[in-house]
């Protein structure tokens, strides 16, 4: 009986998570543009409230990016570890 695992799929999934993390920067910048365009709501684009919101938004996006990127790395590492273990075990049974 042969069991075939698709370890490449695991690696690709990890890479996709990391790529999506990278795409967050574009979303972050789009939101900042919208906030600045609605600066009157904050008391002006240069107001402390507006700038404070943008700063906090940046911190939040940074945390999300770091966590998503780290998760993607862990998924890729797990896939690689499984592939290596599978290869080692398979070799010992040959």
From Swiss-Prot:
It is found in: Secreted. The keyword Secreted applies. One of its GO terms (cellular component) is extracellular region. It comes from the Bacteria. The keyword Ribosomal protein does not apply. Its main location: secreted. Keywords: Secreted. Belongs to the WXG100 family. ESAT-6 subfamily. Strongly interacts with EsxK to form a heterodimeric complex under reducing conditions. This is ESAT-6-like protein EsxL.
């Amino acid at each position: 009986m042969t069991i075939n695992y698709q370890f490449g799929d695991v690696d690709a999934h990890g890479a996709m998570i990391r790529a999506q993390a990278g795409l967050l920067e574009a979303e972050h910048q789009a939101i900042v543009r919208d906030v600045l365009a609605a600066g009157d709501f904050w008391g002006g684009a240069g107001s402390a409230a507006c700038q404070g919101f943008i700063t906090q938004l940046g911190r939040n996006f940074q945390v999300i990016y770091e966590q998503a990127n780290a998760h993607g790395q862990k998924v890729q590492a797990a896939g690689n570890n499984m592939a290596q273990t599978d290869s080692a075990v398979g070799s010992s049974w040959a």
